[in-house]
UniProtKB/Swiss-Prot annotation:
It is found in: Cytoplasm. Belongs to the TPP enzyme family. This is Sulfoacetaldehyde acetyltransferase. Its EC number is 2.3.3.15. Its main location: cytoplasm. The gene is xsc. Pathway: Organosulfur degradation; taurine degradation via aerobic pathway; acetyl phosphate and sulfite from taurine: step 2/2. CDD domains: TPP_PYR_POX_like (cd07035), TPP_Xsc_like (cd02013). The lineage of its organism: Bacteria, Pseudomonadati, Pseudomonadota, Betaproteobacteria, Burkholderiales.
């Protein structure tokens, strides 16, 4: 087949091998990249990836492959695909698929399995792979007969899109071989529409009388390409728009109605504004419990407000918060329909649009001023750590920097159209105060699963999907150690990215719990003194150490120039003090109580 025809899928019924049926169905669904590590279990199919126009990007560890598929899917809006060797290669993917599940990311994991004649005998690399993923997939397809290869392959791609989450295709390794006769199925995509008439009209009636409506824009706005429709609805209502926790790209920060993110270390402006709401439109948001916890000393969620929840997944309607109206529909279509119905209606909030606009601007300005002056943490432990750092010098002779000051400087230096992924951890989560975006599909985090090692592989996958956009990963030194080897993937396969490593020599998020609940009794929290810049250089990347605050912005700009102009990956190692932001979960811990005498001092 000529190179120009390799993406043309055969039509009608043909004789082919199951491997060919699998590959052709992948091509029919637009697959051009897969992530994984080569293996004998799928080698027959892998052999024809290249002539089909599919690039297999080899990784260092399969968890990284799953995260890369997640990042790829979240940027492109298409499937991200991960594949690996049966048994350990597949079990290594579980954490990455779990993170994709909580991000509602259309990742397809292809899991070749032990051959049918060896199942149940405890053979080499044998594992029961379907139970591994049953909690973290929307659909699991098991190829029970090679003649059904195309059918099941097509279905997992369809269901990943229609159900907005990962799906699994499990294939006994001997089922790639043989001769079958089949037709390659065409992709099926669901048109969700704008919801039911009764729920739409109920929402309109609530909005007619609302005095202070607020929109909470969630992941459904991003995944549904609904930002423009969200803007139109917000402008019609004069409503401030808060974004959901770790959904900072769901509304453009340059828009005057943008208020910032809710959740841990989110925007005080957004919290103060939503606290005034009498009607909240949760647009594509499940209003997750962690993302609406009290923050900055404010229990801000408006408990008396009427909530209109718009969700493509009906099982999320009213799941977390009591709602007045639930609309099961596409965020884009629902927002557009509400705007249409409200266009010529006099609303109770129309008369106060100008006053509310002033309130929004005032709250945002106050928050920005506070961030400018909030150069360091102010709790007693952090103040002790700041004092301690005054007598220390970094290995390169500089100073340890305040994380908040660093994050502000990074924010100022962000290039246009940037994509950012953040790992879990104390400094990375404080970054929620500072990260803002002007286009969707720009921000990626491990969401409710909260696993370490997420940021670097995810941004590599994102960069594969959008090579023309700057790509930056944020990680603390603890989380960085879990996936920094994927720098080799970026270097080997010419996928240039920039990583910022906050080197504060500790597992900060958990250590903060030991500060607040365990009287500073530190166990297993210290991480001493690797040179991540030197490690990056050993892996073939560039490395920069920053230990002067005035160098933060220029270092990022230099690394981005290397990425975009020279195709180079760079690790920026920023030396930070040991000060710590608030704990994630004050609600989840208690002061210790001891009953036995030998532990009586451990309170």
């Amino acid at each position: 087949m000529a190179a120009t025809d390799n993406r043309k899928v055969v039509e009608g019924v043909h004789k082919m091998t199951p491997s060919e049926a699998f590959v052709e169905t992948c091509v029919a669904n637009g697959v051009s990249e897969m992530f994984g590590i080569m293996g004998s279990a799928f080698m027959d199919a892998m052999d024809i990836f290249a002539p089909a126009g599919i690039r297999l990007i080899p990784v260092v560890h399969e968890q990284g492959a799953a995260h890369m598929a997640d990042g790829y899917a979240r940027v492109s809006g298409r499937h991200g695909v991960v594949i690996g060797q049966n048994g350990p290669g597949i079990s290594n993917c579980v954490t990455g698929i779990a993170a994709a599940y909580w991000a509602h990311s259309p990742v397809v994991i292809v899991t070749p399995e032990t051959g049918t004649m060896g199942m149940g005998l405890g053979g080499f690399q044998e594992a029961n792979q379907l139970p591994m993923f049953q909690e973290f997939t929307k659909y699991q397809g098991h190829v029970c007969n090679p003649k059904r290869m195309a059918e099941f392959t097509g279905r997992v791609f369809d269901r990943a899109m229609s159900e907005m989450g990962p799906t699994q295709l499990n294939i006994p390794r001997d089922y790639f071989y043989g001769e079958i006769e089949c037709e390659i199925p065409k992709p099926m995509r669901v048109d969700r529409g704008h919801g039911g008439e009764a729920s739409l009209q109920a929402a309109v009636e609530l909005l007619k009388t609302a005095k202070f409506p607020v929109i909470l824009a969630g992941g459904g706005v991003v995944m549904g390409d609904a930002v423009e429709e969200a803007k139109q609805l917000a402008e019609r209502l004069g409503a401030p728009v808060a974004t959901g926790y770790l959904r900072n790209d769901a509304f453009p920060a340059k828009h005057p109605l943008w208020a910032g993110p809710l959740g841990y270390q989110g925007s005080k402006a957004a919290m103060k504004l939503i606290a005034q709401a009498d009607v909240v439109i949760a647009l594509g948001s499940r209003m997750g419990p962690f993302g609406t916890l009290p923050q900055h000393g404010m229990d801000y969620w408006p408990k008396a407000a009427k909530i209109i929840q718009i969700e493509a997944d009906h099982t999320n309607l009213g799941l977390v918060k009591k709602i007045a109206v639930g609309i099961n529909g596409d965020a884009k279509a629902v927002a557009a329909e509400l705007s249409r119905r409200l266009a010529d209606v006099t609303l109770g909030c129309d008369a106060t649009k100008a006053a509310r606009a002033d309130t929004i601007a005032t709250e945002k300005a106050a928050w920005e001023k506070e961030l400018d002056g909030w150069t360091h943490e102010r709790d007693p432990y952090s103040l002790d750590m700041i004092e301690e750092a005054k007598g220390e010098r970094t290995p390169t002779g500089g100073s340890y920097l305040h994380p908040r000051q660093v994050l502000r400087e990074l924010e100022k230096a962000m290039p246009a159209r940037v994509m950012v992924s953040t790992d879990i951890g104390n400094i990375n989560s404080v970054a929620n105060s500072y990260l803002r975006f002007d286009e969707p599909r720009s921000f990626f985090a491990p969401m409710s699963f909260g696993n370490c090692g997420y940021a670097l592989p995810t941004i590599i996958g994102a960069k594969c999907a959008a090579p023309d956009r700057p790509a930056i990963a944020y990680a603390g030194d603890g989380a960085w150690g879990m996936s920094m080897m994927e720098i080799m993937t970026a270097v080997r396969h010419d996928i240039p990215v920039t990583a910022v490593v906050f080197h504060n020599r500790q597992w900060g998020a958990e250590k903060k719990n030991q500060v607040d609940f365990y009287n500073r009794r530190f166990v297993a929290g210290e991480l001493e003194s690797e040179s991540f810049s030197d490690i990056a250089k050993a892996m073939g990347a560039e490395g920069i150490v920053v230990d002067h605050i005035e160098d933060v912005g220029p270092a990022l700009q230099k690394a981005i120039d290397m990425q975009m102009k020279e195709g180079k990956t760079c690790v920026i190692e920023i030396m930070c003090t040991r000060e710590l932001g608030d704990p994630f979960r004050r609600d989840a811990l208690s002061k210790p109580v001891r009953m036995l005498d030998k532990y009586k001092d451990y309170v």
